[in-house]
UniProtKB/Swiss-Prot annotation:
Residues 85-269 form the ATP-grasp domain. It catalyses: (3R)-3-methyl-D-ornithine + L-lysine + ATP = (3R)-3-methyl-D-ornithyl-N(6)-L-lysine + ADP + phosphate + H(+). Pfam families: ATP-grasp_3 (PF02655), PylC-like_N (PF21360). It comes from Methanosarcina acetivorans (strain ATCC 35395 / DSM 2834 / JCM 12185 / C2A). SUPFAM superfamilies: Glutathione synthetase ATP-binding domain-like. Mg(2+) 1 binds at residues 227, 239. Is required for the biosynthesis of pyrrolysine. Catalyzes the ATP-dependent ligation between (3R)-3-methyl-D-ornithine and L-lysine, leading to (3R)-3-methyl-D-ornithyl-N6-L-lysine. This is 3-methyl-D-ornithine--L-lysine ligase. Disruption phenotype: Cells lacking this gene are unable to translate UAG as pyrrolysine, and do not produce pyrrolysine. GO terms for molecular function: ATP binding; ligase activity; metal ion binding. Binds 2 magnesium ions per subunit. Its EC number is 6.3.2.59. L-lysine binds at residues 11-12, 72, 246, 302.
Length: 363
C-alpha cells in the first residue's frame, strides 16, 4: 500500500485524501491547525508547522511515498520549494508553474505570449469583471457596471472585460514531456462566483488543445487546472491554477474513470500517457447543499464549507456518497453517478430523500 502525505487539511486536502483512498492509499495529513477540517478523515494526522519544525517533516518523508502540498499559504509553498531536495520522497508539485499561475498578471502575460485567448484588460467601457491578483478567483470577484465603482476598488485589483458564458474547467497532468488532458467539467457558480456544483461536459477539442498548449509551454511537471469562459465570443481562458484542485477531481473520477492522484504519481514515476479517448457514457453530479434552520437546502460554495470544523463521510451506497461538513449550519457534499445523466439524476432524488428522512430537509 502506498502512503501519501498531504500538507494542508482544508478542502484541497479533502479532495486529494478522497481520491487517495479511492486508490487504496494511506493518507497522512499535516496541518498546523489542531482543528483542521479533515483531521478525522485522514488515516494519520500530525499537527505542527512545517516551517518551524522541518525536521518532523523530513522524518515523515522517510515513511511515505510522496508529499503533496494542498494549501495556498505562499510562505509554506516557498519553504517546501527550498527544502524539496532534502526529502526522502518526491514532492508532487510544480513550483515554477505555481509561481506563474498564482500571480494572475503573470498568468495573463503567459497566455498572451503563446497566443491563448483571454479577456481584455481594462476595457474602455463597462461592464467590468474585477478580481484580486493573487487569490482563488472567487474571492472578491464581482461585476462592476459603472465607472464610479472603479475608483473605489482596492489597490491591485485586476480589471477585465466581462465575458458572458459558462465557466468550464479542464485538468492537465504533465511529466515535463507528456501532458494528459483529462475531462471537461462545467462549473456551476453562485452570486459570489464560488462553485456549488460540478457536472461533466462532452469533449471540446478547442479547449483540449488550449489546455495542452498551456501545459506544454511551461513545461508542466505536476497538475494544472485550466478555467475558461465558453460563450458567444468563443473560449477565453480566465485562469490557470498549478495546484491540486478541489471539487472537479471527484466529478472527473466518476465521469471518466481517471483518478488524478494516481495520474499525478505516474507523472513523477514512470511518466504519463497523453489521453486519446475517454468514456462518454458516464455522468456525475457533485454539489454542496447547506441545511438551513427552516429545512431548506441551499446551494453554497467552498467559502461556506471552509468555515466548518469537521468534514467526513456520512452515507454511501452504489451511485451515492454523502459527506457532512459540521459547522454553524450543516453542509452536505453530495456525489451521484451513473451510466448516464438520467441514472445520476435518479440517484440524486434518492440522496435528497435520505436528507429528508434523516434531517427533515425540505425536498
Amino acid at each position: 500500500m502506498k502512503t501519501i502525505c498531504l500538507i494542508g487539511g482544508k478542502l484541497q486536502g479533502f479532495e486529494a485524501a478522497y481520491l487517495s483512498k479511492k486508490a487504496d492509499m494511506k493518507v497522512v495529513v499535516i496541518d498546523k491547525n489542531p482543528q483542521a477540517l479533515i483531521r478525522n478523515y485522514a488515516d494519520e494526522f500530525h499537527c505542527f508547522d512545517v516551517i518551524k519544525e522541518p525536521e518532523k517533516l523530513l522524518e515523515i518523508s522517510k515513511n511515505v511515498d510522496a508529499i503533496l502540498p494542498v494549501n495556498e499559504n505562499l510562505e509554506c509553498i516557498k519553504f517546501l520549494s527550498s527544502v524539496k531536495e532534502e526529502f526522502s520522497c518526491p514532492v508532487l508539485f510544480d513550483f515554477e508553474a505555481y509561481r506563474i499561475s498564482r500571480d494572475k498578471k503573470k498568468s495573463k502575460e503567459y497566455f498572451r505570449s503563446i497566443g491563448i485567448p483571454t479577456p481584455q484588460d481594462k476595457p474602455g467601457r463597462p461592464p467590468y469583471f474585477v478580481k484580486p491578483p493573487c487569490e482563488s478567483s472567487s474571492v472578491g470577484a464581482r461585476i462592476i457596471y459603472d465607472e464610479e465603482e472603479l475608483g473605489e476598488l482596492e489597490p491591485g485589483m485586476l480589471v477585465e472585460e466581462y465575458v458572458e458564458g459558462e465557466v468550464i474547467s479542464l485538468e492537465v497532468i504533465g511529466d515535463g514531456t507528456h501532458f494528459a488532458v483529462v475531462k471537461e467539467t462545467l462549473i456551476h457558480i453562485d452570486r459570489t462566483y464560488d462553485c456549488h456544483m460540478v457536472t461533466p461536459l462532452p469533449s471540446d477539442l478547442s479547449f483540449r488543445e488550449i489546455s495542452y498548449s498551456l501545459a506544454a509551454n511551461l513545461p508542466l511537471k505536476g497538475i494544472m487546472d485550466v478555467e475558461a469562459i465558453s460563450g458567444p465570443q468563443g473560449l477565453k481562458v480566465i485562469e490557470i491554477d498549478s495546484r491540486f484542485p478541489s471539487q472537479t477531481p471527484t466529478a472527473v473520477y466518476y465521469s471518466s474513470g481517471v483518478n488524478l492522484i494516481e495520474l499525478l504519481f505516474r507523472a513523477f514515476g514512470e511518466g504519463v500517457e497523453e489521453v486519446k479517448t475517454l468514456p462518454e457514457d458516464r455522468y456525475c453530479i457533485y454539489e454542496h447543499l447547506m441545511l438551513a434552520e427552516n429545512g431548506a437546502l441551499i446551494p453554497v460554495g467552498e467559502q461556506v464549507l471552509s468555515m466548518g470544523n469537521d468534514y467526513g463521510k456520512y452515507y454511501e451506497e452504489p451511485g451515492i456518497e454523502i459527506f457532512l461538513c459540521r459547522g454553524e449550519d450543516p453542509v452536505f457534499t453530495l456525489v451521484f453517478w451513473g451510466k448516464d445523466r438520467e441514472e445520476a439524476e435518479n440517484k440524486k432524488r434518492t440522496g435528497l430523500l435520505i436528507l429528508k428522512d434523516r434531517f427533515g430537509a425540505a425536498v
